[in-house]
């Protein structure tokens, strides 16, 4: 059932200045193009203000400089995009698990469950688990031995949390993710791979969100650590012993090899690959499809991906790259020949001056000058 909130209540909740009918009931947040009666939309960029003329929304979130272009009720704020996010949170009617425990779940008798915990169908909770207040665990999740889950954390369906993992407060883990599986640790002996026991765990801070089908491996000896406020997209691989600093964002498909240390407030673009045993300092942005092979010690933006181009142009570029060493050798040969030529010209010039008797005359005038 849709949530209904009056415009005046929305204004009070987000600290907006209201213009128009305060009693309008808002049920949905929509784009300017698709908004209908009862919907609220937002104008983030003044370039799109002309779209307000045909907008059917009941209200618009916008900044003061765009108010005169709005023909319906408005909520005026300094940051329309941030205000839209707050309104969307208030109007979010996504189905959530209630504070009850389904009888089909299997919960070990010595596990500890806090107040208002919700457990969905076919959840398995093994021994020694500590689940704090207001935690919700959707259907099909498996929680291994001695796991700790902090207040208000939400696990969507079919999440697997291996033994000993610690998850902080108010985290969200989307469906299909696996936390605490063995890291890829082996030693080769006489041509045979021998498995190295992964004795560490995974430690996740507070307010962390992990997307669907992401895997975070447990440490070999020390823990794999995810800092507070980290956001990780879908289908990422975080290998053993990795440490990710607080408020770092990692887009979909990123692969982080073992023992990487990533600083605070970094942004890792989609499908990037980070080599093992390196360090990335705070406030580094790595653009999509990049391959990071060595440590980064200075904050900034780094890239190595190849942008798309027409196939014929790409084939020419690839062919040129294959010839780069021979081209470099030719350039060096040409430089050597040019330098040799100028040397011969200069020596010849002075020889001619000496033979013609002009050199003493030139020297005399230079000295007089």
Swiss-Prot record:
GO terms assigned for molecular function: N-acyltransferase activity; UDP-3-O-(R-3-hydroxymyristoyl)-glucosamine N-acyltransferase activity
InterPro entries noted in UniProt: Hexapep (IPR001451), Hexapep_transf_CS (IPR018357), LpxD (IPR007691), Trimer_LpxA-like_sf (IPR011004), UDP_GlcNAc_AcTrfase_non-rep (IPR020573)
UniProt entry keywords in alphabetical sequence: Acyltransferase, Lipid A biosynthesis, Lipid biosynthesis, Lipid metabolism, Repeat, Transferase
Catalysis: reaction(s): a UDP-3-O-[(3R)-3-hydroxyacyl]-alpha-D-glucosamine + a (3R)-hydroxyacyl-[ACP] = a UDP-2-N,3-O-bis[(3R)-3-hydroxyacyl]-alpha-D-glucosamine + holo-[ACP] + H(+); UDP-3-O-[(3R)-3-hydroxytetradecanoyl]-alpha-D-glucosamine + (3R)-hydroxytetradecanoyl-[ACP] = UDP-2-N,3-O-bis[(3R)-3-hydroxytetradecanoyl]-alpha-D-glucosamine + holo-[ACP] + H(+)
Pfam families in alphabetical order: Hexapep (PF00132), LpxD (PF04613)
Cellular component terms (Gene Ontology): membrane
Xref: SUPFAM superfamilies: Trimeric LpxA-like enzymes (SSF51161)
Keyword Repeat found: yes
Family: Belongs to the transferase hexapeptide repeat family. LpxD subfamily.
Function per UniProt: Catalyzes the N-acylation of UDP-3-O-(hydroxytetradecanoyl)glucosamine using 3-hydroxytetradecanoyl-ACP as the acyl donor. Is involved in the biosynthesis of lipid A, a phosphorylated glycolipid that anchors the lipopolysaccharide to the outer membrane of the cell.
Protein name per Swiss-Prot or TrEMBL: UDP-3-O-(3-hydroxymyristoyl)glucosamine N-acyltransferase
Lineage: Bacteria, Pseudomonadati, Pseudomonadota, Gammaproteobacteria, Enterobacterales
Gene name in the database record: lpxD
């Amino acid at each position: 059932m849709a949530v209904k909130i009056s415009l005046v209540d929305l204004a009070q909740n987000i600290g907006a200045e209201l213009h128009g009918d305060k009693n309008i009931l808002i049920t949905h947040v929509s784009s300017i193009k698709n908004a209908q009666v009862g919907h609220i939309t937002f104008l983030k960029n003044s370039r799109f203000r002309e779209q307000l003329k045909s907008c059917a929304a009941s209200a618009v979130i916008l900044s003061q400089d765009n108010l005169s272009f709005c023909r319906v009720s408005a909520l005026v704020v300094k940051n329309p995009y941030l205000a839209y996010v707050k309104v969307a949170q208030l109007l979010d009617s996504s189905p959530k698990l209630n504070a009850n425990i389904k009888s089909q779940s299997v919960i070990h008798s010595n596990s500890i469950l806090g107040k208002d915990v919700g457990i969905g169908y076919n959840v398995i909770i093994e021994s020694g688990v500590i689940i704090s207040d207001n935690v919700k665990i959707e259907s099909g999740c498996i929680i291994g031995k001695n796991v700790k889950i902090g207040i208000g954390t939400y696990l969507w369906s079919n999440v697997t949390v291996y033994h000993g993992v610690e998850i902080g407060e108010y985290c969200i883990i989307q469906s299909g993710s696996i936390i605490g599986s063995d890291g890829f640790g082996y030693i080769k002996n006489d041509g045979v791979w021998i498995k190295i026991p992964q004795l560490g765990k995974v430690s996740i801070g507070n307010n962390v969100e992990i997307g669907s089908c992401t895997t975070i491996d447990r440490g070999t000896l020390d823990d794999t650590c995810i800092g507070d406020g980290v956001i990780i997209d879908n289908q990422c691989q975080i290998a053993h012993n990795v440490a990710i600093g607080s408020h770092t964002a990692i887009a979909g498909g990123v692969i982080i090899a073992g023992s990487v240390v990533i600083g605070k407030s970094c942004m890792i673009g989609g499908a990037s690959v980070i080599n093992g045993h390196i360090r990335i300092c705070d406030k580094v942005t790595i653009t999509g499809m990049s391959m990071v092979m060595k440590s980064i010690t200075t904050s900034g933006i780094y890239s190595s991906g190849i942008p798309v181009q027409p196939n014929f142009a790409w084939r020419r570029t690839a062919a040129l790259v294959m010839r780069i060493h021979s081209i470099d050798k030719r350039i060096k040969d040409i430089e050597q020949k040019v330098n040799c030529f100028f040397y011969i010209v200069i020596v010849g010039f002075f020889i001619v001056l000496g033979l013609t008797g002009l050199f003493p005359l030139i020297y005399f005038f230079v000295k007089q000058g």
